Amino acid sequence: ELIGAANRDTKSFSINRKDAKERVAKAAR
C-alpha cells in the first residue's frame, strides 16, 4: 500500500515536472 502511494506520487510528480517544462518552453518563446 505504501509503495503504491509512493509510485503514484512519483508518477504525478514527473507529470507535473513535464508540464512545468512545457510551460517554461512556451514562456521562453
From Swiss-Prot:
Listed InterPro entries: Ribosomal_uS7_dom_sf
Region (Disordered): 1-29
Compositional bias per record (Basic and acidic residues), positions renumbered to this chain: 8-29
KW RNA-binding (keyword) present: yes
Keywords: Ribonucleoprotein, Ribosomal protein, RNA-binding, rRNA-binding
A Gene Ontology molecular function term of the record: rRNA binding
One CC-aspect GO term: ribonucleoprotein complex
Alphabetical list of SUPFAM superfamilies matching this protein: Ribosomal protein S7
Assembly and binders: Part of the 30S ribosomal subunit.
Family: Belongs to the universal ribosomal protein uS7 family.
Purpose of the protein: One of the primary rRNA binding proteins, it binds directly to 16S rRNA where it nucleates assembly of the head domain of the 30S subunit. Is located at the subunit interface close to the decoding center.
Identification of the protein by name: Small ribosomal subunit protein uS7
Species classification: Archaea, Methanobacteriati, Methanobacteriota, Stenosarchaea group, Methanomicrobia
This protein's encoding gene: rps7
